[in-house]
Amino acid sequence: MPDELAEQMPVIKDVLRAMNIDIIEKEGYEGDDILGTLAKYGEKQGLEVTILSGDRDTFQLASDNITIRIPRTKAGKTETENYNRAKVLEEYGLEPVQLIEVKALQGDTSDNIPGVPGIGPKTAVSLIQKYHSVKELYEKIEKDEDDLKGKQKENIVANKDMAELSRTLGEIHKNV
């Protein structure tokens, strides 16, 4: 967290308390992890859960009962777009949970997730569409059952640890 924001946290918490808004935090976890835990808990209780977030990483939480509302500004007007399981599947051709796998390969500089050098968003999506997960991708490579070639294969093989670390870093915890 940037120092400027950290300095403001006590004031923000005071304002939230004054508005009778609950504050939930847990040492060692990010807000996304708490959000993921609460969303999945609500879903298990039979609730329809809506998350309003500008962070597309939350798409991995989308399901038939969890909707992610993403604000976007178009022609000076802010609107929200809803993403549930069906919308993620339609837009990415992947199940929401597979977006973690995509991030493991492509990385995300804004979240300090390294990914695999040379793998961009389109390649990451197509690899996960074909191999379903990072684990399965590497299993196919080890069994020589993949169709990767050249520099791409070299990068993926050489950066297995980085891909696995990136997957861990990109996954929102749901049991905090």
Residue ranges of predicted features:
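Extended two-metal-dependent nuclease catalytic cores across DNA- and RNA-processing enzymes
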Residues: 2-176
